[in-house]
């Protein structure tokens, strides 16, 4: 209710400063028990996926709360699950500023953040301080200084550390803002990475007496052959879920915009159709072998339903929150609940 009034003020700041201010305001509102003024109630529609029970299928995508410093305030908005990160083994600053740009005419964002985060130890401190008892995903990546041939070491180091704190762990191999990272989506390299992660996951499950599912986040910039190969490797290595999709390098939908040439990943409305197309093709290739979490360009309840209709079991929001505000969470939860009830 308040966000339409606040948005013009926030948009006077550069995008990254506005992001920081918004999170501080949410924290303050949560402490003062004022969150209901910012968000509408979310419908309860439990979904079973990856062996977990999600109160509703609408989650927060990774990237908004990289360090897990705002979990409680964000959870109070009505999300069915929260995903924090991307986190790397060691702290890193990310790419030079400016690195986050709004394209309001397209309801889009370009970012080249570069996995800026305080490191896995700091994230875990924040998780321990949180009171949140719901489904918490932790998204892991590699440090920029780690050679791509040693990337598996960073992913394993993160997995070791976050395992006990996470409801599920997401392996981010699709950010366009870490040099050569998307190479890890390719056949042999992806196969080796997934095999190593699966082996470690099973060892950690024995060690902790608890199985924590692994999901992999993929890019929208994949052809049909690549989608089929990724589906085969995910299934063959016993991965528990897949998140489709990350941001796109394509600028076709924003051609002619003054910021078109800014480097980084494009998100928001322009990626909606491509993300949904990847979900539909991935769903066909997987044949129900694992759940898909659909993300990309969700700015309305209808957009969320579109992802479920294409084959996703769950959805996630990020850029839509920047343009629509916290009310989007409840809108998507109500729309998806209505869709799932009608389907069942």
UniProtKB/Swiss-Prot annotation:
NCBIfam families: PRK05286.1-1, PRK05286.1-2, PRK05286.1-4, PRK05286.2-5, pyrD_sub2. It is a peripheral membrane protein. Binds 1 FMN per subunit. Its EC number is 1.3.5.2. Belongs to the dihydroorotate dehydrogenase family. Type 2 subfamily. The keyword Membrane applies. This is Dihydroorotate dehydrogenase (quinone). Its cofactor is FMN. It comes from Chromobacterium violaceum (strain ATCC 12472 / DSM 30191 / JCM 1249 / CCUG 213 / NBRC 12614 / NCIMB 9131 / NCTC 9757 / MK). Its main location: membrane. It is found in: Cell membrane. Catalyzes the conversion of dihydroorotate to orotate with quinone as electron acceptor. The gene is pyrD. It comes from the Bacteria. Substrate binds at residues 66, 111-115, 172, 177, 246-247. Gene3D superfamilies: Aldolase class I. GO terms for cellular component: cytoplasm; plasma membrane. Pathway: Pyrimidine metabolism; UMP biosynthesis via de novo pathway; orotate from (S)-dihydroorotate (quinone route): step 1/1.
């Amino acid at each position: 209710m308040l966000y339409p009034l606040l948005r013009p003020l926030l948009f006077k700041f550069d995008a990254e400063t506005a992001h920081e201010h918004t999170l501080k305001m949410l924290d303050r509102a949560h402490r003062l028990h004022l969150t209901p003024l910012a968000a509408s109630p979310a419908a309860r529609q439990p979904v079973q996926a990856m062996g977990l029970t999600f109160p509703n299928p609408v989650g927060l995508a990774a990237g908004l709360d990289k360090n897990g410093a705002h979990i409680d305030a964000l959870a109070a908005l009505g999300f069915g699950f929260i995903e924090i990160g991307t986190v790397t083994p060691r702290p890193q600053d990310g790419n030079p500023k400016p690195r986050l740009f709004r394209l309001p005419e397209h309801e889009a964002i370009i970012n080249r953040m570069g996995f800026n985060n305080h490191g896995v130890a700091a994230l875990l401190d924040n998780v321990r301080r949180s009171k949140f008892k719901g489904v918490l995903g932790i998204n892991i990546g590699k440090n920029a200084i780690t050679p791509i041939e040693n990337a598996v070491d960073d992913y394993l180091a993160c997995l070791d550390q976050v395992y006990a704190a996470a409801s599920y762990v997401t392996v981010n191999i699709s950010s366009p803002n870490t040099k050569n990272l998307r190479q890890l989506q390719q056949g042999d390299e992806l196969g080796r990475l997934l095999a190593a992660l699966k082996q470690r996951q099973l060892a950690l499950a024995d060690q902790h007496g608890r199985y924590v599912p692994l999901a992999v986040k993929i890019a929208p910039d994949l052809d049909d052959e690549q989608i089929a190969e990724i589906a085969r490797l995910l299934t063959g290595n016993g991965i528990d879920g897949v998140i489709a999709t990350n941001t796109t390098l394509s600028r076709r939908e924003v051609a002619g915009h003054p910021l078109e040439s800014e480097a980084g990943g494009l998100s928001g409305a322009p990626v909606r159709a491509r993300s949904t197309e990847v979900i539909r093709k991935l769903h066909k290739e997987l044949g129900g072998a694992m759940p898909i979490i659909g993300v990309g360009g969700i700015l309305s309840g209808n957009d969320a339903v579109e992802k479920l209709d294409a084959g996703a079991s769950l959805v996630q929001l990020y850029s839509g929150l920047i343009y629509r505000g916290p009310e989007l969470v409840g809108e998507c939860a109500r729309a998806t609940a209505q869709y799932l009830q009608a389907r069942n």
